[in-house]
Every structure is written in C-alpha cells, then in structure tokens.
C-alpha cells in the first residue's frame, strides 16, 4: 500500500509563519499560497514554506500536493465564506462553524447558548442610551469599528465610517454595549481526538488609533475632534492572574459544548474575545473560531503550553500535531471537512 504524503498549507498572511513553522517541527512539508510580493517572506527571510503557490486559492495544485488547508482570519476574509464552504481541499476544522462566526446574530445565539456573560446588543440605534461599539460582520481586524455615545452620534459616524444612511442598511452591523474593562483574548485548542480543551496562550491587541490617542492631551483631542478607531496593528503577550484562569477555561468548555449542539462541534484553535471588568467578570463580545494572530508572540510556546508539554508548543504546532496523530490513528477524515 502506497503511503500518501500529506502537506500542510495556509494562506500567506495572518499567522502563516507560525503555522508553517509548527508544521515543519512536526515533520510535515509545507505550502504557502498568496501574492507574488510576499513570497520572499516565507521562502527567503523566514524559510518556512517548502512550496509557494502564487494565487488567491490554487485549488488544483493544492489537491495535487495532498494539502490540508489551515484556515486563518485572512484566509476567510480574502476568499469569503461561500468559497471556503465549496472548496475541495481538506480543511482542518468544521466548515459549518464559519457561518456562525461570520454572522454576528448567529454568533450571539452561540455565545448565549454557552451561557457566557455578554454585552447588551441594540437592534434599534435610536434606543442607544449608553456608549456602544459598532462592528461590521466578519473578520476584518477591527476595521470599521467605532464608538458612539447616543443615536445622533451613531448616525453621524455610521455614515462617515461605513457609508450607511438608513436602518435598512444596518443588517450587516452589530451595535454592542461598550463594556469598560481590560481586554483579554484567551487562545484555546480543542482536540477532537482526545476530547480535551487546552488553554494555549493569552494576548491583548495593539490597535490604531485607540492605543496611541492617550499620548495626545485631552484638550487637544477635543480640539482635533479625533475619532477612536480599532484597527489591529499587533499583539502583546499576557499572563492572566492565576485566580482568573478557571473563568476563561470554563468559558471555553461551555463554548465547545454549545457548538456540539448547534453545529456539530468546534475543534482546533479558537479565541474568545472579551474584557475583565473591575468586578472581575469575564464579558465576551465575540468569538474567532480559528487560529488568531494573537498566538503569534508564542511561536516558541507560552507559559501555559510549557506547563502542559514541557517543550516548545505554539498553536500552529499543536494544529500540526493533531493532524499527525490523526494520520497515525487513521482518523484524518475526522478532523477535516
């Protein structure tokens, strides 16, 4: 019997460096695909790709190379949910999750099912009675987010930032209560093989311009009429106060359980994005049901993965290990879709 060589592939952006490095650490050949301009990043400056395929999604070449594709935020954003759902290349994870993650109304239903603490959502902007954060649907790295303090402020900014002028165009926007607290982004991995949840790492985001605006005196901020934006520029590692760890772990467990009931399961990496309030409540405002860029500071592992593995273990490498174990146990079909 001829043994098929499986290669690990991902879109050349987001967390591809980490994913491909982790795959090589687990003994896989690797494939990056994307624009010609970034090819040197993955083959010269950081040589983690054995193959680089130019193109948005070169399906025939990926099939020929027996690739398993690892989804990232950039992958879904550039290709779109519909194309990803139709793709023939084996996809690590459950594709049914994509619809629930990319639609904020379905996402809300999922998080409510998990019994997580959530911010209030406003269906009608005229009901806004406290600061809110407005978010377009889908993974866009914080682009298009803005804060509004009342209905008038909302309508002024939603036209400015999103080009929306009436309520009929708000179906792809969610208006959330703005919860004051410390941003915390725990990264999880759920193994379909062992049925175990792992806390991989935690980060907080470095965003433009909200993380720079404090360097401008408040008087000047008012005179300049600056609008706060939340475009993600990078990520900062975070070690959480130990007494709070069970809060984020239990939230992750409930999220996995809810996914099993709603969409047939969530496996692989995911992230609950939220804040800890001054009362130490973990309030979750959204989920990323795939690897997040916040795992990139931990290419050599995190304090939490060292406690479990006692060896360098990034989220990218943990994905590759799950695939390797699935192949060894003849269960690859169980972890791809």
Swiss-Prot record:
Record key words, sorted: ATP-binding, Ligase, Magnesium, Manganese, Metal-binding, Nucleotide-binding, Purine biosynthesis
Q: Which PROSITE patterns match?
A: ATP_GRASP (PS50975)
- The entry's ATP-binding residues are 125-185, 207
Reaction equations catalysed: 5-amino-1-(5-phospho-beta-D-ribosyl)imidazole-4-carboxamide + formate + ATP = 5-formamido-1-(5-phospho-D-ribosyl)imidazole-4-carboxamide + ADP + phosphate
Q: Which GO terms describe its biological process?
A: 'de novo' IMP biosynthetic process
Q: Which GO terms describe its molecular function?
A: ATP binding; ligase activity, forming carbon-nitrogen bonds; magnesium ion binding
Query: Which residues take part in binding 5-amino-1-(5-phospho-beta-D-ribosyl)imidazole-4-carboxamide?
Result: 14, 74, 235
The highest taxon in the source lineage is: Archaea
InterPro entries xref list: ATP-grasp (IPR011761), ATP_grasp_subdomain_1 (IPR013815), IMP_biosynth_PurP (IPR023656), IMP_biosynth_PurP_C (IPR009720), IMP_biosynth_PurP_N (IPR010672), PreATP-grasp_dom_sf (IPR016185)
According to its UniProt record, which protein family does this protein belong to? Belongs to the phosphohexose mutase family.
Q: What is this protein called?
A: 5-formaminoimidazole-4-carboxamide-1-(beta)-D-ribofuranosyl 5'-monophosphate synthetase
Which species is this record about?
A: Pyrococcus abyssi (strain GE5 / Orsay)
Source taxonomy lineage? Answer: Archaea, Methanobacteriati, Methanobacteriota, Thermococci, Thermococcales
